[in-house]
């Protein structure tokens, strides 16, 4: 069933709400006396995937609309499937009924970065594309925390047994850290965003540093976006403060070579992870949690906007 028209939606819209979708604020929190110089990260949803079902009538109606809409580039068109990009290639759309039926999944998928869409583009996408879908919901949400801080010297670890991969830059310092695997329900990336933009010839970053902690959530994990990194720690451990010589040597070894963790017994791994947390005056994930808490309601409004009928808040 096609939902209400654009004019009716716009009557209820307060402009600042959608304008702020990609500009989630900074929290006023700080960690402690050791970290007052660290600015709060900027927080946003950086990627979204929405899936749903098109019934036969809506599939025909949407296909007809897309074939004449100048903001859409359509290809791979058959009676039961199509692919498209919309809004200057910022939105990817795919419909495949045969594949969906054979794999027992929903037949339409829409992928986009909400940070790259204007308020009017969000309304256009919601009204003209998403409104055709039934039983729609998120299958991917990416939370992005942007720090104007050099995170290359921080030590990141997880309380869980997840795969950790590190890539080093030309200067020998860590430039990208991965936790988990790409196809898992949660995949964490910590990387030098300023360097990435430079490599991709994107807009220059004016700040001295820009690092991103990005948490990619898929499938069932999207429901836990507001509590999805409690096991993660981004630390500055001071191994020299450890009194016991043997422990000090082992911690130094573990901080210097990730492969050494695999040689420890499980109980020893737990012991030294706790010790590393104790000797760090800062854990940036505390700042991430307080920032997320301060912005949770605004982020939930974004989710509600995409998932529900057009009901705008005051």
From Swiss-Prot:
Keywords: DNA replication, Plasmid. One of its GO terms (biological process) is DNA replication. The keyword Iron does not apply. InterPro entries: REP-like_C (IPR003491), RepD-like_N (IPR054456). It holds the Pfam family Rep_trans. This protein is probably a specific topoisomerase involved in initiating replication. This protein is specifically required and may be rate-limiting for replication of the plasmid in vivo. The nicking site of REP proteins is sequence, but not plasmid, specific. Belongs to the plasmid replication initiation factor family. This is Replication initiation protein. It comes from Staphylococcus aureus. The lineage of its organism: Bacteria, Bacillati, Bacillota, Bacilli, Bacillales. The gene is repC.
């Amino acid at each position: 069933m096609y939902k209400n028209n654009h004019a009716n939606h716009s009557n209820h819209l307060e402009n600042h709400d959608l304008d702020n979708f990609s500009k989630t604020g900074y929290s006023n929190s700080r960690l402690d006396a050791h970290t007052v110089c660290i600015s709060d990260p900027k927080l946003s949803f950086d990627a979204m995937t929405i899936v749903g079902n098109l019934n036969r009538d809506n599939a025909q109606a949407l296909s007809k609309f897309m074939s004449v809409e100048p903001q859409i580039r359509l290809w791979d068109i058959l009676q039961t499937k199509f692919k498209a990009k919309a809004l200057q290639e910022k939105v990817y759309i795919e419909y495949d009924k045969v594949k969906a039926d054979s794999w027992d999944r929903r037949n339409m998928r829409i992928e986009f970065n909400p940070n790259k869409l204007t308020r009017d583009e969000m309304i256009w996408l919601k009204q003209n594309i998403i409104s055709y879908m039934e039983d729609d919901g998120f299958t991917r949400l990416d939370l992005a925390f942007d720090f104007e801080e050099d995170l290359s010297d921080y030590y990141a670890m997880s309380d869980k047994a997840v795969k950790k991969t590190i890539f080093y830059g030309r200067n020998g310092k860590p430039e990208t850290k991965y936790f988990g695997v790409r196809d898992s329900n949660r995949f964490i990336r910590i990387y030098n965003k300023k360097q990435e933009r430079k490599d991709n010839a994107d807009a220059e970053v004016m700040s001295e540093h820009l690092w991103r902690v990005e948490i990619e959530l898929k499938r069932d994990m999207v429901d836990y976006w507001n509590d999805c990194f409690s096991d993660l720690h981004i630390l500055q451990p001071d191994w020299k403060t450890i009194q016991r010589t043997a422990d000090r040597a082992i911690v130094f070894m573990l901080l210097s070579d990730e492969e050494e963790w695999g040689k420890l017994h499980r109980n020893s791994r737990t012991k030294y992870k706790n010790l590393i947390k104790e000797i760090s005056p800062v854990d940036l994930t505390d700042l991430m949690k307080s920032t997320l808490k301060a912005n949770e309601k605004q982020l939930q409004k974004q989710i509600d906007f995409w998932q529900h009928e057009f009901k705008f808040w005051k």
